[in-house]
Amino acid sequence: MEKIKSFTDLIAWKEGHKLVLNIYEITNHFPSKETFGLTSQMRRCVVSITSNVAEGFSRRTTKDKIQFYTMAQRSLTESQNQLLITRDVGYIKMKGFKNLPHRQLS
């Protein structure tokens, strides 16, 4: 196992980054009326996941690390909710929905 030297070596960051790229691709196809609504909210939310993982990695104390990793988990949960809404309003089809790296979603 390789030594973790950077936040980019963390599995959580790598998976989160894949999600960011997926969400940006998906939201590129949303209706323009969602530019300042769901599109903006989803993008901010997934960027928050990887940003909090990165910031948590740089923190010195375990307490601080846990705080930022917990915020990343909260943002992930929020993004799961947004993906369910996106599916339910018809902005994404089930096939595309199932291909997302959100294995916890049904």
How would you label these PLM feature ranges?
Residues 1-106:
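Amphipathic alpha-helical assembly/interaction segments
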